[in-house]
Amino acid sequence: MSDLDYLVIAPHPDDAELGAGGAILLLKAQGARVGVLDLTDGEPTPHGSPEIRRQETEAATAVLGLDWRGNLGLPNRSLVADLPARHRLAGQIRQLRPRFLFAPYWEDAHPDHVAASALVDAARFWTKLTKTDLPGAPHYPQRIIYYFSVHLRLHPRPSFVLDISPYLEGKMQAIACYQSQFIVGRPTDPPTILDDLRQRARYWGWAVGAGYGEPFVCREEIGLRGLRDLV
């Protein structure tokens, strides 16, 4: 397959949609090649199963119009950023050759999310190594962009907020594909978890003078080629 422009790496199926669903839809509308790599299958959960999660992931993938989606098969609930996991992730990145990586924000209550963030950091470094048994040629993604799919009530200070106003409904549709996670067994009285997600997007849109937004963080400085697209 052709190289990807962006690879969103997620601890579980649904995290990419939660933290970067609007960005994915925007990038696809701009003609970018976008993929998602789920590190685990997300199971066990109270109302899911491996088969249910596969079906939900396929439905969300269709909504997002992804160019590629895969699963690294690492263990849910006990994800660790160890050397075997780093080797597998770095090898996958070298094969897909994305220009940019998206990863979960490093501060979270969920140990899988913390481990996933550290794993992406380490794997990115490994992707450029020579004299190694990693598959593919050396490759080094330009930036890691961190998205927020967190279990803490943080008030982040983002590096930038992306205006996702035209893509908010598509993002919500993709999230709603994961009924076992966000609908089945959840309270039906408003505000529901989907209401909460919409309100968060509205807040970040309001913060930058737009309708709806998604916040992102970069540890490295971000360069601009112009100011035309500032909100």
Model-based region annotation:
Residues M1-L96, V217, D229:
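Active-site rim/loop-helix segments in enzyme catalytic domains that contact anionic ligands
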